[in-house]
Amino acid sequence: MSLTTTNLTSLAATSAATLLGAYALHKMFKNTLTSSPKYMVTDVVAKPGGHYSPAVRHENSLYVSGILPFYADGTFCQGSLEEQVKVVLDNLKLILEEGGSNLANLVSVRVYVTDVEHWPRMNKVYKEYFGEDCKPARAVVPVGALHHGFLVEVEAVGAII
């Protein structure tokens, strides 16, 4: 094959298109892999009592910190286990929505209870929030004690779609 002006022009155009495509993919892939976490600041739930964020958004995931049964004004819910679970799940719902997700897009949930005997009662309230079809991966972890004498704490990971 002899190199003519037409062949060289075609070769140059193909090479340029390939390089531009590769560069565009590189930029897109690089930006996806190097996005920084975004720390949530919100007033829809009580302000954290420690050095942490209520949730952190990274790429298409929302990581929700452990939620205790505080009302938005910072007062405690010292009611029954069922009342505490409702306050916690209401707060989870608010945080997820603020971060661009919702209960239906949860990937995993970790529930801490102060006694494994609380599991059936906690599960009944939990099911009211999630229904029959929404079943994110979940662990229920019995712990010795939680801050302020609370009976339940929940942390979760949600997908942002």
Model-derived segments and spans:
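N-terminal presequence-like segments and the immediate start of the first folded domain
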Residues: 2-90, 94-107, 113-161
